[in-house]
Amino acid sequence: MTGYKTYEYVWLDGYKPESSMRSKVKATDADTPPDWSFDGSSTQQAEGGSSDCLLIPVQTYSNPHGHDIVMTQVQSADHTTHPSNYRAEAEALVTDEWWFGFEQEFFLTDPETG
């Protein structure tokens, strides 16, 4: 597959009360990750009869150890914001002056004293 790139699309599913991260990989000859669809019934984001959902790329991160990572937001098949798309809701609330991100905390302890 010379000339192909692999992208790992990452999104939040529709499970309640807490969403989980989902991902799937696409091989394509596109220089940038294209929009992609998925079956939302398996992620609690659609009913079985009309289960198409769209993954819209928001940000791509190069990964020297494998697939480029594509952070996405979920839209319904008609390109409207999906109810599980919290990013769109947050984006509507803030201006360019705000920063939104994740924080991870670490605690260092002395193994002798605990």
Give the positions of each predicted feature.
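ATP/Mg2+-dependent ligation/transfer catalytic cores
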Residues: 1-114
